[in-house]
C-alpha cells in the first residue's frame, strides 16, 4: 500500500502541474472503487480551477472553489502524468484532463477512492475519513512526549499502535518496521511499556525514516510509481529489515526475523531491538 512518503511524493509531483489550472474534464472509466465515484462528479468539476493540492495522512486533497476532492491510492494505486494521446491501459480508471496535462489513476485492485466533499458539508478536517487521523509526523508538535502520552494505558503491541494511525499518520507497514529498528524497539513490546526516553528515540526514528523515504521518492515493491512514472528507491537503498527475513542484520549480523502481527508481516532484529 502506498504510505505517506509515496503519497507525498505524488503530491509534490502533481502540485506544480495542476495547481492554478482549470480542469477541462474528469473522465471516469470505472466508478466501482472502494466507494462508488459519484456520477455527478465530472459535471461538478468541469471548468473548475484547482486552488491547492494538499495531503492529510495518505489522502490527497484537491481544493476547488466549491469543495475538496479526496483521492486515495488504495492498496496498489498510482497517480501519474501521461501524454493526452496515450491510450488507457487495463486498470486505468480515472483521468483528470487539463489543457496542458493529463493525470491518470491506475488501480488494479480498485481499493482506492475518488470522493467529493462540498464546502456546504463543513470543514474538510471533519470528513469521516480524516476526522480521527493522528498528528502529521513532520508537525512541530510531534515528539516523544506526544507518543508517550498517547501510548499510556495501551496494551497493544507498539507496531500495531503505530499502524492504527490515530497517534501519528502515515507510518504504514514498511516504515513502522524500519522506524522500530532505528529506535531499537522490539515490535512486540506493549505500547504502554515504551519509556519516555525510548519514545523520544522512536519519534526521531519515524521522522528520519520518512525523510529518507521522501528523499528517495518512496518505496516500490510491486505497483507504486511516482507522478512521472518513476519507481521509488527507498527499499533498494535504505531498507534495513523489511523483507530481509533470514538475511544478516546490517548492524550486528544476526539473522532478521519475520513474524505476523494483525495479519501484517513484521521484520526485526532480535539482537538490536529490545523489549
Swiss-Prot record:
**Pfam families found in the cross-reference section:** Fapy_DNA_glyco, H2TH, zf-FPG_IleRS
Per its UniProt entry, which superkingdom is the organism in? Bacteria
Task: List positions binding DNA.
Answer: 91, 109, 154
Q: Which reaction does it catalyse?
A: Hydrolysis of DNA containing ring-opened 7-methylguanine residues, releasing 2,6-diamino-4-hydroxy-5-(N-methyl)formamidopyrimidine; 2'-deoxyribonucleotide-(2'-deoxyribose 5'-phosphate)-2'-deoxyribonucleotide-DNA = a 3'-end 2'-deoxyribonucleotide-(2,3-dehydro-2,3-deoxyribose 5'-phosphate)-DNA + a 5'-end 5'-phospho-2'-deoxyribonucleoside-DNA + H(+)
InterPro entries for the chain = DNA_glyclase/AP_lyase_DNA-bd, DNA_glyclase_Znf_dom_DNA_BS, Formamido-pyr_DNA_Glyclase, FPG_cat, MutM-like_N-ter, Ribosomal_uS13-like_H2TH, Znf_DNA_glyclase/AP_lyase, Znf_FPG/IleRS
Cofactor details (free text): Binds 1 zinc ion per subunit.
ZnF bounds (FPG-type): 240-274
Q: What is its EC number?
A: 3.2.2.23, 4.2.99.18
S-S bonds: none
Per UniProt, which keywords does this protein have? DNA damage, DNA repair, DNA-binding, Glycosidase, Hydrolase, Lyase, Metal-binding, Multifunctional enzyme, Zinc, Zinc-finger
The cofactors it requires, by name, are: Zn(2+)
Which BP terms does GO give this entry?
A: base-excision repair
Q: Where is the active site?
A: 2 (schiff-base intermediate with dna), 3 (proton donor), 58 (proton donor), 264 (proton donor)
MF term (GO), any? 8-oxo-7,8-dihydroguanine DNA N-glycosylase activity
- SUPFAM superfamilies from the UniProt entry: Glucocorticoid receptor-like (DNA-binding domain) (SSF57716), N-terminal domain of MutM-like DNA repair proteins (SSF81624), S13-like H2TH domain (SSF46946)
Which PANTHER family does this UniProt record tie to the protein? FORMAMIDOPYRIMIDINE-DNA GLYCOSYLASE (PTHR22993:SF9)
Q: Which family does it belong to?
A: Belongs to the FPG family.
Q: How is the quaternary structure described?
A: Monomer.
This chain's function reads: Involved in base excision repair of DNA damaged by oxidation or by mutagenic agents. Acts as a DNA glycosylase that recognizes and removes damaged bases. Has a preference for oxidized purines, such as 7,8-dihydro-8-oxoguanine (8-oxoG). Has AP (apurinic/apyrimidinic) lyase activity and introduces nicks in the DNA strand. Cleaves the DNA backbone by beta-delta elimination to generate a single-strand break at the site of the removed base with both 3'- and 5'-phosphates.
What is the designated name of this protein?
Answer: Formamidopyrimidine-DNA glycosylase
Source organism of this protein record: Bordetella pertussis (strain Tohama I / ATCC BAA-589 / NCTC 13251)
State the taxonomy lineage.
Bacteria, Pseudomonadati, Pseudomonadota, Betaproteobacteria, Burkholderiales
Point out the gene that encodes the protein. mutM
